[in-house]
Amino acid sequence: MTISKVPTQKLPAEGEVGLVDIGSLTTESGAVIDDVCIAVQRWGELSPTRDNVVMVLHALTGDSHITGPAGPGHPTPGWWDWIAGPGAPIDTNRWCAIATNVLGGCRGSTGPSSLARDGKPWGSRFPLISIRDQVEADIAALAAMGITKVAAVVGGSMGGARALEWIIGHPDQVRAGLLLAVGVRATADQIGTQTTQIAAIKTDPNWQGGDYYETGRAPENGLTIARRFAHLTYRSEVELDTRFANNNQGNEDPATGGRYAVQSYLEHQGDKLLARFDAGSYVVLTETLNSHDVGRGRGGIGTALRGCPVPVVVGGITSDRLYPLRLQQELAEMLPGCTGLQVVDSTYGHDGFLVESEAVGKLIRQTLELADVGSKEDACSQ
């Protein structure tokens, strides 16, 4: 993977979206994406030595707006709103939190809905990308802003996969990591559910082979069905049954064409995503998740993990059925910088890493303590 050199650019003002040009990127598979732009936001001030950056890495349909209200450039409130700020787990009196919109996304960074050099949307021409490509793009964006090393990387789900690739591929550029609700590779169950979601989008007649952007028709039905299916994997069976059981939605009767309460809930989740996300990005990023394998090209998973010197905290959710605890246990046992799996007790399933603020906040603080130790060790070695 290679990235062309670009002039140094500035960090955006706090909470505002900045667009960082990183030039052309050659992907892991050899494809070239020209004129790549990465959307960036930050909270807190960069230290004079530029050594206090905490990268917050979003999951599949997230973006750079981790905290704060909706506003220009970010139509929804922060998706991890409690994580950063004065006195928060990432205390912006001490740390500078930076978040990007991932390569392939649709909230400012280059993705299939972006215009290629010919002035037309990339669409079906947008290449397959890997988690490693996403990390390379993030690192290039930081470098363009004059940042060559971060204190910590923090992420869950796809963000956890990005954090894992960061510490494996660039251990000299990060002092600590927090890996939440993730595994060393995509499992058969994940690939099965995720390829089914992709199929729901691609079988929508409005998909048009991925080149729908200038037609006035988008695969909205396919995207909402994909999201409904995905959302089932994000929550736990216990939580859903406790909330909805087999109840009807209000006065509706399923026997006469009405809906169940859980059906209405899932439709609402699909409609919410439709208002803020692009189907093309959903397909690209889901395919990226399917290809996740930290051992690829590194002599296998064991070799890749056991050779990583970065101190890490690994956390899992008790009720997570998309990334069950056994996957985090494997990570914790094989990473030499991990002292043991941290288990978060939650009924919220995979989404527990977003919801359980107290427990996950403790893990973030533990990670930043490791980063502080790394900072002192760096100072002693100079």
Swiss-Prot record:
What is one GO biological process annotated to this record? methionine biosynthetic process
Record bears the keyword Cytoplasm: yes
**GO CC terms of this entry:** cytoplasm
Reaction catalysis annotation = L-homoserine + acetyl-CoA = O-acetyl-L-homoserine + CoA
Molecular function GO labels? homoserine O-acetyltransferase activity
Catalytic site positions: S157, D320, H350
Keywords assigned by UniProt, alphabetized: Acyltransferase, Amino-acid biosynthesis, Cytoplasm, Methionine biosynthesis, Transferase
Which cysteines link up through disulfide bonds?
Answer: none
Q: Where does this polypeptide localize?
A: Cytoplasm
- Residue ranges constituting the AB hydrolase-1 domain according to the UniProt record: 52-356
Identify the domain of life.
Bacteria
What enzyme category does the UniProt record give? transferase
Identify the EC number(s). Answer: 2.3.1.31
**Family annotation (InterPro entries):** AB_hydrolase_1, AB_hydrolase_fold, HAT_MetX-like
What family name appears in the similarity comment? Belongs to the AB hydrolase superfamily. MetX family.
Q: What does this protein do?
A: Transfers an acetyl group from acetyl-CoA to L-homoserine, forming acetyl-L-homoserine.
The name this protein carries in UniProt is Homoserine O-acetyltransferase
| Taxonomy of the source species | Bacteria, Bacillati, Actinomycetota, Actinomycetes, Mycobacteriales
The encoding gene is: metXA
